[in-house]
Amino acid sequence: MQTSMSPVYLPSLSERHFRRIETTRRPCKFILAGLGVASLAAFGISAHAADYQPVHCAVHAAYVGSPLHAPVDITATPPVPNKALPAETTRRLDVTYERIQAFTAASAITAAVAIPGKGLWQQTSAPTDAPRLFWASAGKTFTAVVILQLAEEGKLSLDDPVSLWVPDVPNGDVATVRDLLAHTSGLFSANEDLKAHADPRYRDPAANLAIARRHGAMFCPGGRWRYSNTGYDLLGEIVRKVDHRSIDVAITTRIIAPLGLTSMRALVPGGGAVGVAPLTAVHEKPIDPSWAGAAGPIVSDAADMTRFWAALLGGRLLSDGTVRTMARKLYPMFDPGTYYGLGIMVFDVTDDSRSIRWIGHAGGTPGASAVVAYSPSDNAIVAVALTGDAVSVPAANLLLKALGPPK
């Protein structure tokens, strides 16, 4: 079952649109330019064990959730040349960046707008000894790309049961690698455990899986959609077993080094975050970015993030067919207008009475917010990451609007 675009309004610039909304019982909720997305350790929602009864499933379930989005066609984009955008465009982006800095009051921020085939604008304000920013769940796309590369190489199948690679996973004989990528496995996300959330320390994938086992599966694989950071933990473990290297080494070897992304780094899970702008939050103690593991492994400036997405959309990391597969089956997420495929998000929104579609990924955790997205109507890739209690999506929208009317 499919549905047409479900619009969400992207408001104009005002200070309140950059601020998170605090809730009484759930960790913290942001306004993503009108998109209310709950956040806990990079997109999670606080849950109690009593919220559901664990299920044991013998077969993969038919999807019974809210209507799917129609497949989104991803057209290959040319590379981004290493040159500046026209002077007037650069001036407008610079002015917009200054406004964003003032409204967000971010202690560190990096932003970039890349136009494939034309050029790049970028600005970063960060400590000189910590110039990289944390991209939180926007780094999930990197983990997904490695898994999809391994599938193209015939080293695994997206339809492999998870139990083929990782033992003792709830419904692991039924849930597939594809389910982990799409968040349809039913696997409990360990960061939703209230006791674990209150215990600020690194937990490796085995510890997170133990928490997920204790809670049990939330639904039969394929039957519904629910975000699971632990599912991406398991994808990192699958990479380790199939590719014989950790997720950080696999991302570096397969993506960062070949593309020459000199500012970008894949963090060693639990290995600390030296050289990364400190996360700052008023109401909740931030995590060490390296604790996110395969669920959010990337630190970088915004320019390299746009270069990665240009390479992905341009077929330089995966075949065009595989890239299209990432947006073929799109599940509705937390809010109207947001959908999830295989390691990517689709945003369908409205702004000033015009429809906007973004293809990318957002991320958030206490003390950091990030988004990277390709806007087909603008033929541009925008990326923003910042620290503090503000949010990144309104900033990204303002930067795209500074380019002028959509093409």
List the predicted regions and their residue ranges.
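Boundary at the C-terminal end of the N-terminal hydrophobic targeting segment
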Residues: 47-49
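Short, gly/Ser/Thr-rich active-site loops of penicillin-recognizing serine hydrolases
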Residues: 51, 60, 65-67, 349-354, ...
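Active-site-proximal loop and beta-strand segments within enzyme catalytic domains
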Residues: 72-80, 84, 103-107, 115, ...
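Short, surface-exposed loop or secondary-structure junction motifs
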Residues: 173-364
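Bacterial N-terminal signal peptides
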Residues: 33-42
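Short, well-ordered beta-strand elements
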Residues: 369-388
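A short, well-structured edge-of-sheet supersecondary motif
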Residues: 94-129, 135, 197-199, 344-347, ...
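N-terminal secretory signal peptides that target proteins for export/translocation
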Residues: 1-26
